[in-house]
Amino acid sequence: MKKHEIASLSEDELKKQLVELKQRFADIRFNKIVEPPQNPMIFKNLRRDIARMKTALHRYQTQK
């Protein structure tokens, strides 16, 4: 996800997306043992998306 897409999400949507991304990252990481991923850059992209969402959530929480 792009930075502006994440910024447009509400706090609840961010939490939901964060859980989904963490689950997807865990699934891909687990499946890496069985067979290598088609796109190895997916790990880097997912980690960065998770970090962006955590940052946006932190902004919401500090503004309150």
From Swiss-Prot:
It comes from Chloroherpeton thalassium (strain ATCC 35110 / GB-78). Belongs to the universal ribosomal protein uL29 family. GO terms for cellular component: ribonucleoprotein complex; ribosome. It holds the Pfam family Ribosomal_L29. Gene3D superfamilies: 1.10.287.310. CDD domains: Ribosomal_L29_HIP (cd00427). Keywords: Ribonucleoprotein, Ribosomal protein. This is Large ribosomal subunit protein uL29. One of its GO terms (biological process) is translation. GO terms for molecular function: structural constituent of ribosome.
